[in-house]
Amino acid sequence: DGREKEKEYGTYEIPGLKNTRTLLTAKGATPAMCTSMTPQGLAITEDYVMISAYCSTQKHNSVIYVIGKESHNFIKEVILPGQPHVGGLAYDPDHKILWYSSNINGIAQAVSIKMDTIEAYDYDESHLPVDTFQTVSLYGIVRDSFMTFYKGCLYVGCFEKYNESVIARYGVDAEGNLIDTMDEELGMNFEMAVPLDYSTISEQAQGIAFYNDKLLISHSFGILPSRLVVYEQSDKRLYVNENSARTYRFPERLEQIVVEGDNLYVMFES
């Protein structure tokens, strides 16, 4: 049926673009079919390819599509609470936890779900959003547009159209929780995760990934050709165009990227 050829070329079909089972946000647990899902984030686990998507009409709950890594077949949709943009997904393999980007009242947040919870989730049985594990507000970053997990830390980046931006690095404890604190000197009046450090990046960044001693950043905006830019990791943490080691040109709308082993996974919005 052509699947073997598709598998050979390493492609995964993004499900749910024509219609996705989800919930009508304004009516709680009311099942609904969304025809306007926009794919955003990408994560790779031991067994799955996971893609996040949000409703562009702002009527339905956001979702995560779970795809078999070896079979390339769609397994199920996981309904998220509310309508986060879910621009970023990140997988913590040590604690078997999936992170996704969200926000509340204009404050960037990172939300985690245990993989056991994702595997046990059944839309037909519950017609409810999945149970989350931890929700943490992020200090020091305007939006969490994309993210990745690397060497025990969650890296979160912010998309800017025309200006340089940042990647913030946040620590995780032994249980897989983001470490948060209440620091009044930083102007907080509730607990937030505080970055261990920042890196400067060029504009229009959509995704980040690490490979050996290199940092990879995807850049795209609208219908313009996309770029994948490779940098040598540096203590200066200044990853802007003029410091790049190599640049690759990609078709438009390149979104999140993930490195697993020696393989690079890239996702396109449309």
Regions inferred by a protein language model and the residue ranges of each:
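Beta-strand-rich domains and repeat architectures in extracellular enzymes and scaffolds
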Residues: 21-60
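Structural signature of eukaryotic scaffold interfaces centered on beta-propeller domains
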Residues: 31-45, 87-96, 139-155, 201-211, ...
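Blade-loop segments of beta-propeller domains
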Residues: 38, 63-97
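Structural motif
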Residues: 58-65, 106-117, 162-175, 223-233, ...
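Loop/turn-rich, solvent-exposed surfaces of beta-rich toroidal or solenoidal domains
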Residues: 192-235
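Conserved blade-ending motifs and adjacent loop-strand segments that build the rim/top face
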Residues: 200-201, 237-261
